[in-house]
């Protein structure tokens, strides 16, 4: 059957969201292709660098009066034509004019475009516009609220693949591509590991978990006044940090949350929780306290268990062998033996921890008490149930803290190793270029200068040594060094800004990305940056980050930011991530009115 003759799909089966997306795409296509699309330029800020003025002169033509509007095709007849034909004009009904779009271009958006690309914000140069925005969104989107269904931690290997497989400009050399990859890796370390105070980074989440665990232990200590029996008070006292640190080289009074990273502290906390279950649990679920990961239990002895205990008897939390989805190289692990969980609760906790260590679920809760475990244990009297609940939450948080610390350490060392490899690769590239010039005997002054330059680059790169203690300082030195390499320094930021502004204001299509949830996310993030502005993460700003990932620094929350302060894009950006557009049939004012300087299919440029 001929595809042209096939009937269109029935409209009732199309979802409203898909229909809205198609309408939005068709509207964008009309804006790009319509030669009568006009643009109104709004001066809402200063133009200190003359970029906005030069952009308007290059790509827009002002319309000052009706004669210019007629020449641009916006109007049909001038006032002189109307006056000359006034006596012979017949009374005919006024024609119905089609409506054409008017796009509003704000000067502030043009100014803020400097930091709306990976080149301007992170100094990652040489990428095409589409790849540049993808890399920029991966780094700038770290503080966004996570989607509980689709969020995954981005690891260094996946991010480097994104940059390595990206499309580069045709004039970019191999050395410039390697420099861009190294700069992107260094910025990834800063954005995801060293920025302690920004929501969405692993170190910020680790600090918040340490603070939450301290609060849980403080509340558990406060329950001692509810118990009069010395045996019960002693059982709860064994679960507190002071007792768990006894005999260890770290003390809770001096090291505070740093003791949570100690393996012996974790083992003692699990043993104390096991004893607490054995003494306080009345439903029978706490009698079998784990350690048996093979799932072999007596299937006939369920008479003393509660219905929830029977349902979860064969699906213990500690039985499953889990792996982090984006860090499987860290190996398998088991969760602690937490009781009073149904089969659904066990599956939910295991899935949340293996997916993102509970980050997405934690970011959706309002109270830290309800971290991952369900509230309302009814297996004992309220006093005992509350004490078991606090101790169970603390033990589960301890396991996640240790897993998160291990992933942070691995990411940090892996990035340092990759950056050191990039530096060595650059040294080999420049040595190879110098060898080619030497074989050609450097016959003229230009070749001799090039040979001297390559030798200077090799000498400077040999002094770049990335370490854990001086990462930020070394990275700043590396950024300063690559500014002296012509292959990287000559990549123009102005051209990248022009391509971005031409695309977002519907003048010329700069990239044709398929409509996916990821591209919609990039579009919203881009317009948030264009409207509100941003600051470049360059050598002047990087020294404010600390290179130390010590236990004391990872657990330090004295000067932390608010617990949950994600980057809110605002309802206006979420609802309409694009320029303001209105449709008009008549032009009454010519103030601030512009049209494209080049029309579609004319010499000098194309709108599509």
Curated annotation (Swiss-Prot):
GO cellular component: host cell nucleolus
Region described as Disordered: 1-33
Annotated compartments: Host nucleus; Host nucleus, Host nucleolus
Broad class of the protein's primary localization: host cell
Composition bias, Pro residues: 1-13
Zinc-finger listed as a keyword: no
Keywords tagged on the record: Host nucleus
One Pfam family of this chain: Herpes_U5
Biased segments, Basic and acidic residues type: 18-33
Family membership: Belongs to the herpesviridae U4 family.
Complex formation: Interacts with host KAT5, PSME3 and EP400.
Function of the molecule: Promotes a cell cycle arrest in G0/G1 by inducing the proteasomal degradation of host histone acetyltransferase KAT5/Tip60.
Protein name, as recorded: Protein UL27
Gene (UniProt): UL27
């Amino acid at each position: 059957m001929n595809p042209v003759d096939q009937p269109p799909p029935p409209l009732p089966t199309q979802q409203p969201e898909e229909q809205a997306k198609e309408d939005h795409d068709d509207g964008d296509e009309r804006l790009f292709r319509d030669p009568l699309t006009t643009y109104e330029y709004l001066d809402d800020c200063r133009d200190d660098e003359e970029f906005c003025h030069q952009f308007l002169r290059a790509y827009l033509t002002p319309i000052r009066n009706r004669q210019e509007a007629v020449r641009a095709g916006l109007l049909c007849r001038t006032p002189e034509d109307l006056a000359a034909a006034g006596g012979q004009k017949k009374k005919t009904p006024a024609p119905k004019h089609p409506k054409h779009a008017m796009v509003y271009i704000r000067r502030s958006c043009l100014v803020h475009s400097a930091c709306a690309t990976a080149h301007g914000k992170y100094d990652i140069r040489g990428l095409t516009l589409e790849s540049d925005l993808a890399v920029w969104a991966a780094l700038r989107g770290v503080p966004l609220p996570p989607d509980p269904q689709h969020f995954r931690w981005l690891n260094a290997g996946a991010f480097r693949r994104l940059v390595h497989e990206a499309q580069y400009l045709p004039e970019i050399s191999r050395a410039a591509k390697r420099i861009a990859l190294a700069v992107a890796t260094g910025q990834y370390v800063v954005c995801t590991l060293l920025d302690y105070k920004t929501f969405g980074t692993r170190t910020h989440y680790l600090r918040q978990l340490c603070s939450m665990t301290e609060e849980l232990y403080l509340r558990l200590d406060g329950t001692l006044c509810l118990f009069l029996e010395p045996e019960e008070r002693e059982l709860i006292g064994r679960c507190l940090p002071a007792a768990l640190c006894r005999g260890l080289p770290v003390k809770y009074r001096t090291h505070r949350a740093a003791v949570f990273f100690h393996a012996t502290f974790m083992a003692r906390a699990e043993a104390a929780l096991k004893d607490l279950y054995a003494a306080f649990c009345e439903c029978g679920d706490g009698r079998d306290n784990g350690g048996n990961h093979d799932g072999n239990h007596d299937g006939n002895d369920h008479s003393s268990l509660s219905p929830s205990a029977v349902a979860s008897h064969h699906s213990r939390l500690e039985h499953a062998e889990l792996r982090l989805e984006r860090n499987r190289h860290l190996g398998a692990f088991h969760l602690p033996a937490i009781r009073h969980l149904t089969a659904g609760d066990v599956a939910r906790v295991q899935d949340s921890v293996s997916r993102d260590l509970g980050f997405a679920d934690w970011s959706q809760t309002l109270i830290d008490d309800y971290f991952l475990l369900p509230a309302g244990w009814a297996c004992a009297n309220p006093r005992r149930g509350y004490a078991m609940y606090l101790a169970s939450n603390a033990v589960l948080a301890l396991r996640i803290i240790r897993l998160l610390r291990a992933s942070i350490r691995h990411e940090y060392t892996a990035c340092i190793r990759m950056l050191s490899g990039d530096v060595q690769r650059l040294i080999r590239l420049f040595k190879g270029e110098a060898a080619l010039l030497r074989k050609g005997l450097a016959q003229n002054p230009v070749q001799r200068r090039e040979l001297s330059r390559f030798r200077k680059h090799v000498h400077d790169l040999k002094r770049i040594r990335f370490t854990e203690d001086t990462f930020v300082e070394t990275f700043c030195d590396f950024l300063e060094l690559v500014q002296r390499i012509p292959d990287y320094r000559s990549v123009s930021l102005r051209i990248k800004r022009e391509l971005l502004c031409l695309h977002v204001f519907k003048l010329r299509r700069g990239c044709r990305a398929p409509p996916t949830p990821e591209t919609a996310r990039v579009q919203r993030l881009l317009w948030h940056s264009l409207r509100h502005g941003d600051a470049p993460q360059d050598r002047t700003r990087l020294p404010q980050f600390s290179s130390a990932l010590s236990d004391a620094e990872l657990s330090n929350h004295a000067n932390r930011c608010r617990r949950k302060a994600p980057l809110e894009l605002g309802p206006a950006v979420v609802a309409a991530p694009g320029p303001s557009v209105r449709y008009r049939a008549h032009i009454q004012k010519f103030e601030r009115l512009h049209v494209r300087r080049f029309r579609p299919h004319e010499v000098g440029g194309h709108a599509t």
